[in-house]
Amino acid sequence: MIKRALISVFDKTGILDLAKFLESRDVEIISTGGTYKHLKENGVKVIDIEEVTGFPEMLDGRVKTLNPLIHGGILAIRDNEEHMKVIEEKGINPIDMVVVNLYPFFNKVEENLSFDEKVEFIDIGGPTMIRAAAKNFKDVVVLTDTKDYENVIDEIKENDQVNIKTRKKLAGKVFNLMSAYDAAISNFLLEEEYPEYLTLSYKKNMDLRYGENPHQTAAYYTSTVGKYPMKNFEKLNGKELSYNNIKDMDIAWKTVCEFEEVACCALKHNTPCGVAIGDTVQEVYTKAYECDPISIFGGIVAFNRKVDKETAENLAKIFLEIVVAPDFDEDALEVLKNKKNLRVIKCEEKSTEGKDMAKVDGGILVQKSDNKLLEDTKVVTEKSPTEQEMKDLIFGMKVVKYVKSNAIVVVKDGMAKGIGGGQVNRIWAAKEALDRAGDGIVLASDAFFPFGDVAEEAAKWGIKAIIQPGGSIRDEESIKVCDEKGISMVFTGIRHFKH
């Protein structure tokens, strides 16, 4: 039975209802600082923690609850006679419930504050209390999540106590929270690319209907710190997002964020099927659609500019899973909302430089994101590309980095007309891209040509210019073919494998 509770919260959501309920059950409430003031001002009978400890708050609030008279009351095991004898001798009263939420370090670390100001939001007393309460969960109920208040109130109403299963779960939530909290602090202080221990701080954003396939359970977690596109987007319409939706949306958004020009990316199964740049959203959508009018069906379309009504009307003509853009004209949004299942996503955050992670069985691979497009660009053939061809070559290289290797993209006038990817050899990827394009001006490759066969195949289809990293021991073979066929070729020095 709960006789004494300690309440100290930064987030005051729901705390009055909980405190007044406890008061109605004759529970003695101890509190600190701002929480004490808030409860007292709202008519709750509450004891200042200084009355319990006999020691005033000190060091600008850094020391409030760090006292044996508090922690002895939390940690004492009730059915341990020696424990109870000791706390009685020391004048310590047991504390049966601890309600604490922490200083909002997750949020403050991203604000425009000085380093020292951010450090002040590293909570010490709160974590110490909740860890102590969680360790002694058989005797102490610990609440760190405002969403748990109602359930605990209901259990006490029904049973006069909180059952052991709930206590254990609440204790588990403490250490789950502290892992994320400590991870965020560790990463803030270390500032290391690859620390000795990889600690990640993510919070569940939503449960998903299923994973990649219906038999796989899934959930979506987002970073507790920082601003990221796939964390800060807003869903304006449509069904709940699926596991595959989020993965696809991420790649589609990253693709359009590559471009300063107005850009559109149509994507299916995590691979672009049509990408285009131009002067207006309507133009780039039309061009992206024409790249592959079959594969776009049931796919995702992303823009890096606001969507207008005319474009929305064209988008509404076909079945799409998602449309994502920085914004939508009001009348464009009304058009898209007529398709109740279409997920309309507003995403204003640009794709960020960061880390890529891939889970393997028993480990995690971590690498810098592929944010470097070119190194030392040089023409290696007798013929040089024209100005327009060079623009298309750079465009193609920006697209090919988002296609699964081996990858080839064929481009004409700012359109990725043919995309070939996921092949185990480069010539197959080239044949796939060239065949899909039908016609094209330039060809981009994510990695070097191991033989001259890709250049030979490109010549058959009338390709005028090629861009690739270079670096093969047989580079001269490809250069020779290009010179013989009148094709210009540019080496970039940067490979863009995507596995």
UniProtKB/Swiss-Prot annotation:
It comes from the Bacteria. Pathway: Purine metabolism; IMP biosynthesis via de novo pathway; 5-formamido-1-(5-phospho-D-ribosyl)imidazole-4-carboxamide from 5-amino-1-(5-phospho-D-ribosyl)imidazole-4-carboxamide (10-formyl THF route): step 1/1; Purine metabolism; IMP biosynthesis via de novo pathway; IMP from 5-formamido-1-(5-phospho-D-ribosyl)imidazole-4-carboxamide: step 1/1. It holds the Pfam family AICARFT_IMPCHas. Transmembrane segments: none annotated. Residues 1-144 form the MGS-like domain. GO terms for molecular function: IMP cyclohydrolase activity; phosphoribosylaminoimidazolecarboxamide formyltransferase activity. SUPFAM superfamilies: Cytidine deaminase-like, Methylglyoxal synthase-like. The IMP cyclohydrolase activity resides in the N-terminal region. This is Bifunctional purine biosynthesis protein PurH. It comes from Clostridium botulinum (strain Okra / Type B1).
